[in-house]
């Protein structure tokens, strides 16, 4: 039993139910479809595209949701922006052309982080 439940019983308060996070459908997404998962609709999951894959970052809503430090990445292919460690919206693309070895290494570090933290739920169709 969680500490919250114990305290709720002892203090005679009802637990406040926690709303479940919206679940993302496991499938392939077009860039246009991905844009609908940017956090503007709280009933929908938050999705991010990176190097041809789509990740469900809903559990990181504080980071990837509206107003979060990485909120601008939600609903977009942020491959190039992550490689360049940039928030420049002009870099929200899957284009790897011209990236140097350091940028490609940085991108791999980001991908490793996403793979370890968020479920990969599909592919980004424009990158196939």
Give, region by region, the residue ranges found by the protein language model:
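Histidine-anchored, small-residue-rich loop motif
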Residues: 2-128
